[in-house]
């Protein structure tokens, strides 16, 4: 089993548990160049809020798009947008990525901005 298949297997297991709980989830995805975050409704078919380093507003406020500072900016933005829509409690879906580096930076920034998970 290769690295990507292992990550997807871990992500599927976590998503199944979150769906069982019926929680709104904060989903993250990272690539070497960008970080993406979405708040998804419990039914799994509606995106409530989204933020990423691809967006011009966020990209202009940071020097690089693929580092921890960029992830923190995305975390702050997604928290603000979710709270604006009335969502304050979420389940953190790390998509099988290790809770370290950019993933942890995004999560901590979202918590500091007011999201609870």
From Swiss-Prot:
GO terms for cellular component: cytosolic large ribosomal subunit. Keywords: Ribonucleoprotein, Ribosomal protein, RNA-binding, rRNA-binding. Gene3D superfamilies: 3.30.420.100. GO terms for biological process: translation. The keyword Electron transport does not apply. GO terms for molecular function: 5S rRNA binding; structural constituent of ribosome. HAMAP family: Ribosomal_uL18_B (MF_01337_B). This is one of the proteins that bind and probably mediate the attachment of the 5S RNA into the large ribosomal subunit, where it forms part of the central protuberance. Belongs to the universal ribosomal protein uL18 family. NCBIfam families: L18_bact. Part of the 50S ribosomal subunit; part of the 5S rRNA/L5/L18/L25 subcomplex. Contacts the 5S and 23S rRNAs. This is Large ribosomal subunit protein uL18.
């Amino acid at each position: 089993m290769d690295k990507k298949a292992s990550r997807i297997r871990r992500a599927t297991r976590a998503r199944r548990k979150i769906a069982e709980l019926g929680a709104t989830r904060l989903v993250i995805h990272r690539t070497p160049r960008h970080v993406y975050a979405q708040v998804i409704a419990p039914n799994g078919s509606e995106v409530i809020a989204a933020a990423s380093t691809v967006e011009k507003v966020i990209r202009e406020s940071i020097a690089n798009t693929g580092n921890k500072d960029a992830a923190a900016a995305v975390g702050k933005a997604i928290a603000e947008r979710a709270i604006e829509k009335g969502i304050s409690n979420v389940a953190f879906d790390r998509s099988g990525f290790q809770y370290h580096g950019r993933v942890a930076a995004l999560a901590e920034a979202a918590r500091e901005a007011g999201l609870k998970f």
